[in-house]
Amino acid sequence: MKKLLNRLVAIFSIFSLLLGFSSAQARVDGDVITLGAAVSLTGKYSTNGEHTKNGYNLAVKRINDMGGVKVGGKSYKFAVKYYDDESNSKRAAQLAERLIKQDGVKYMLGPYSSGLTKAMAPVTEENKIPMVEANGASRSLFTKGYKYLFAVLSPANQYLEVAIDLAVEKNGGKPVKIAMAFEQDAFSQDVRLGILDAAKRTKSKIIIDDKLPKELNDMAATLAKVKAVKPDVLVVSGHSKGALTAIRQISEMKVDVPMLAMTHCDASKLAKQHGKKAEYALCASQWHKSLSYKDNYFGGGLKYDKDFTAAYKYAPPYQAAESSAALLVYKDAFERANSFDTKKVRDALAKTNMQTFYGNVKFGSGGQNTAKPMVLFQVRCTGDKCENKVVAPTKWASAKLVHPIPSWSKR
């Protein structure tokens, strides 16, 4: 009996080695490192969920085609195990548990949105599973003391602060009147906090502070108030659907405002969807193809834009670019750790200091990227062709800001 037991233990040990992972090691089968991801393929975040998945997949293919990930003198390829989180926080948390407990995944990629990242982070943290995420920008993610969460993007409160600074500058340095309407999700509320901070810093006044409806399909009540009280700047954050709704109703109601600052213009393909109706909208972005960052995998932003467009038949929004950057960060960390031990790779992630086509990546103590500023672009049209032009920061600007926005009667 004892001999049989010893033999079974030996067989199990060999089997575990062949599988290539233990309780502290990444899911490695042969020469494949499997990462886990729950992304929104259905539900209200499905558009950006698709961008996220496409960004991950493009980087996986590029890294694998260029020799993969080198650990211990051997080359490994990336693969991603996907599930649809249905744009639902509870489902996202359940899938994180499933990926870790049932599928044996030891390294995670983030979902789309701050809310879903917030749902998954406690699960990955409890299990000491590193998660490199690209689409959860809420600053509250980085104040929880998480040690296994790393975000390649800039925090949400930084998205539109610079728009208020620009409005004040264009107002001769004097405070401005601000109207704002926000979705009630974690990301948008953090953008709102950034606006409140900017208003306080510049002594500007918030004259409208509205909540967007849950379905993001009507903001006429807010726009009627804007027409009545005439703010200097209108700020809107409601993910892709909110951006499209805002432009549609602003044009229908002929709402004149000197500055319109928004989020998710590129993810919603605003310039393409609404054309000249979207002209002069000022948009926060984590990335733009014209920026000068470089790496050895995608070259620069223009090359990434070309490669992504060839693969998926549409131009990449920043949600795709930052998702690709997450894979480059993982590759770098695995190779510096020279190990599949989760703690060693976690420690390597914490010491990340690199440049990618998307931007510089260096993590603060809370896991946020401290090395990359936001950019602002403005939708500009020549004839019927509309595109995004970077207007801030000045060092990357490809066009001058048009301010104030011409009234609808003159457009």
Regions found by a protein language model. Name each.
Residues 29, 33-57, 83-89, 112-113, ...:
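Extracytoplasmic "Venus flytrap"
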Residues 27-28, 34, 47-54, 66-143, ...:
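Beta-alpha junction/loop-to-helix N-cap segments that form part of ligand/metal-binding clefts
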Residues 1-34, 408-411:
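Short, low-complexity disordered leader/linker segments with a strong preference
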Residues 90, 105-209, 258-283:
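Extracytoplasmic ligand/sensor domains, especially the bilobed periplasmic-binding protein
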Residues 250-324, 391-411:
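Extracellular/periplasmic periplasmic-binding protein-like sensory domains
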Residues 114-125, 231-253, 326-327:
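Hydrophobic alpha-helical
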Residues 26, 33, 350-411:
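Solvent-exposed, acidic/polar segments of extracytosolic/periplasmic ligand-binding ectodomains
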